[in-house]
Structure formats: C-alpha cells, structure tokens
Regions:
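Hydrophobic/aromatic-enriched cytosolic interaction surfaces used to assemble or bind macromolecules
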Residues: 1-312
C-alpha cells in the first residue's frame, strides 16, 4: 500500500481549512435570481464569478422554497471554487421586493424620525407593515423606502446560515443596479429611461435627478415589438406631461446586445435623446470551465458593480 501523504489525512485537511478561514477573509458577492445563484470573489487581485442553477421551483416569486437544498448549493459552489473564509453580501432577487419614494422627505434633512413619520402614513404597496421589513435610504435628493416580507428576508438569511457563512450585508438587485446606473450616468443632465427584463415582461423605470419616479411593467408574451414600443412611448409621454418636463431622455437598456436593437426605435434623436449604455470597466472572469451555462446578464453585472462602488 502506498504511504498516505499528510495532505490526504482528513484531520490535516480540516486544520488547513480552519487556518485558511482565520488567515484570509474573502468578500463574496452573492446575487440570487429566480433561476440561479451567482457568486463573485477576488483572487490574486482579479475578480471571478461562478453560477449554479437552482433546482426546479426552488425559488418562487423571490421566496426560497427549498432552503436546505439551496444552502447546500451555495456551500458546494464556494467549496468547489476553493473559496474559504467567505463573508457574504447578498443581493435579493427582483421579485418579492418593493420600493417607493417617500413624500416630503429630502436627503438633506434625512433622519430616522422623518423617515419613520413618512412610513407611518402608509405606502402604496402590497406589504403589511406588521409583517414586513422596510429600510429607508437617501437617493440623490430624495429618500427611497425598500420593503420585503419578513418571512422572505428570514428565508434568505436561513439559506446563508445553514451554509455556515457570515452574512455581512443584504441589498436588492434593482435598487443596487439603479444606484450604479446613477453613478455611471452622472454627467447626463436629462432624464433617464431604464429598461430591463422582469421574467417574461419588460420593466421601465423613469428617473429624474437620480430619483426613480416611475416603475412600470409591460407584458411581452404575444405582443408585437411595435405595440410594445408604442405602450412604452405612451408611458414616457404621460410622465413628461404630468411633470411638465420635456427634457432629452438618456436610455439605458439592460438587455443582451441582440435584444437592445428591439428598443432602439424608442430613442428620438430629434429630441436629443441618446443611448447611455457604455462598456463596463469591471468584468469578472468566469471561474473554470463550468462557471455556468450563461454569461452574466447586463442587469446582474450592473447590480454587482453597484455592490462594489460606494455611491454618495
């Protein structure tokens, strides 16, 4: 029998793993979607990413339905990628989380009392105040409340806890991506129209001075592109009329390049509209050959960049 090397002894392996945890804390960004989990981390000054698909129906409307299975998937993804000592920063899925701009509360006078008073007046969203968690944060010159059911937030906390990982931060994919978008388009002085996929639908967010004022979803199944374009145009025109604000629009399209072409007719050059999309300076590399079947989507990458950049 060939001699057993020290590295193959289970006790030594456990000791080495524990030592790695003590010596190196690894920041890991974890982005959860309805379909998959994406993890990003830094290794030797370079950023990498890897994804794993959830089992069927594991995540439904943003809620983890199979916590133990999902926890094992998270643990396995990091273990197979040799990521030890991870401290997780989690981005919640698009579904199940809501946001609203607080009326009468400006970022210049933002404090907990002002936001609490605004929240106590009730918000037009499908969340029960007694059964939800709400946080209010400055957004440009306004304050935005982001809310989620406590059961959903606790379910995601449980997924991370069962993987024996410390959870350092929880954010939301959409609001984090919007903060990054504001940062990337800071030199644009007009309004911003942001389009991205939401399941089989298309979501439009209209932004003025860094504040999201309209968030509307458009069905896409069975709808001809021309009809969809017309619907979006009507919403934009209604917003501009209501605000008495007819300024050029900068469009940010968070779709794969081939899908962006569908929405290019929305950009009205005669009104000095333009496409704000720009190449991302941060492009993590896939980890290994089995990093995932699909590349990072533009919305996912926008949100991950938002986690890395402190935006004031």
């Amino acid at each position: 029998m060939s001699p057993l090397s020290l590295a193959e002894i289970p006790q030594v392996q456990a000791f080495q793993t524990g030592l790695k945890r003590l010596l190196g804390v690894r920041r890991v960004l974890a982005l959860a979607t309805q379909r998959r989990l994406i993890c990003c981390w830094q290794h030797k000054s370079l950023w990498y990413w890897r994804s794993i698909d959830w089992p069927p129906d594991a995540c439904r409307d943003g809620m983890p339905m199979q916590r133990e299975v999902m926890s094992e998937a998270l643990e396995e993804l990091l273990f197979d990628s040799d990521v030890v000592g991870a401290r997780l920063e989690l981005l919640l899925p698009v579904d199940g989380v809501y946001w609203r701009v607080l009326d009468g509360v400006g970022a210049d006078v933002f404090d907990s009392d002002a936001s609490s008073a605004a929240l106590s007046n009730g918000l037009d969203w499908p969340l029960d105040p007694s059964e939800s968690y709400v946080t209010a944060t400055p957004c440009a010159d306004a304050v935005v409340a982001v809310g989620v059911k406590r059961t959903m937030l606790q379910a995601w906390i449980d997924v991370v806890a069962q993987a024996d990982l410390p959870l350092q931060r929880v954010d939301w994919l959409v609001s984090c991506a919007q903060r990054c978008l504001h940062h990337l388009s800071s030199e644009w002085t007009g309004g911003v129209a942001w389009l991205f996929s939401h399941g089989s639908a298309v979501r439009l967010v209209l932004i003025h001075d860094g504040v999201p004022e309209v968030d509307q979803t458009f069905a896409r199944d069975g709808i001809e592109p021309e009809a969809l374009i017309s619907e979006i145009r009507r919403s934009v025109s209604a917003w501009q009329t209501l605000m008495n604000r007819f300024v050029p629009l900068g469009w940010w399209l968070s779709f794969p390049e081939s899908h962006n072409q569908i929405f290019m007719p929305l950009i009205d050059a005669a009104r000095q509209d333009c496409l704000l999309n720009q190449p991302f300076a941060w492009n993590p590399a896939p980890w290994g050959e089995d990093s995932g079947d699909d590349p990072l989507e533009p919305l996912e990458q926008l949100a991950l960049i938002g986690m890395l950049v402190e935006i004031h």
